[in-house]
Amino acid sequence: MKSRLPLPPPSALLPSFKGGLHDRRTATAIGRLLGVAMLVCMVTGVLSHYLQHPPSWLADDLPARPSWGYRLNQGLHVGVGIAAIPLLFGKLWTVYPKLFAWPALKSARHALERLSVAVLVAGAVFELLTGLLNTVQWYPWPFSFVPVHFAVGWLLTGALLLHLAVKWPDIKAYWWRRSAATRALPAEPENTPDRRSLLTGLAVAVGAVTVTTVGQSLTPLKDLDLLAPRHPDHGPLGLPVNRTAAAAGTTRVDTAAWRLTVRGPRPYELTLDELAALPQYEVELPIACVEGWSKNAHWTGVRIKDLTERAGAPGAALRVVSLEQHGAYRVMDMGRSYARDPLTLLALRLNGQVLTPDHGYPARIIAPNRPGVLQTKWVTRLEVR
């Protein structure tokens, strides 16, 4: 009878990791930068969500100023999110040997740490990947992007807080490098990059992806946005377009038959010529889209507050209805804070020219501090609420 050879212990089957680039100090150095990036993305993401989908109790009190607020918010959200991608790769590369640690679970605290790491990694990869694909408007999944992205963001925040609580002793020890023990790095094998090279490489990667994408919202760098899906100058009348008239089914608007219908205590209708004969105002406001691109433009049109006042409801909240028959935003609610703001227009002209079909001809909404999807195009009706 043949004797069987004894199986090696699990630890003997695990890979051996050497060098100073998988140590706690390096992980903490990268982790604090990634943590700040995630915090910025979470805060700006929540602000963006509630500006785009406000609860009923908040809708009338959303701030219309500063007029560039949403542009800054969404530029930070997308720009920092893209910059976080190389940081996440660097963090995962530094800590991945921990995945092979044995025994897999040592204690209840260790189990919590493992659970938080699993959710944290999965959530971070999901948020950054889906967010990046959203910037190019590619959605190769069966679910709705906005609610799922928002929900996973909260899940990721919870996992991050749990992870920080579990790892707080290490963070406290290595963040400020208080002792010789925490300042010391493990010996590094020959011909391997050192910690400084790793951090320098990450800094270069973050700088490169930022400089080549942030120009879609930061005008001085617009000619360097080689990797951005939008250039702020490319589009009809010098302004990009997300949803075209062809996609909305509004390429052929019968100008002679078109009417602006305003419903309120004193309802009325206006032809395009009658609307153009009303006092016109010019404002400079940005279009800022959730995908991250934005640009200032000059808009000319009639103040919304003048139209609601004529209907007997000055400064009232509105429901704006588009000629578009299909689309998530063909009907848009506008709270009182926007409707009574003097910068909010029913615009007829863009940069001195009559609106093109892609920009919402014959009339569109433009309002300060408001997501681009809520700047309704091809407007046909205003309903006082």
What is the meaning of each model-derived region?
Residues M1-P232, G249, V262, Y361:
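Membrane-embedded alpha-helical bundles that constitute the cytochrome b-like, heme-associated redox core
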Residues V214-R385:
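Structured, non-membrane catalytic/scaffold regions adjacent to prosthetic-group chemistry
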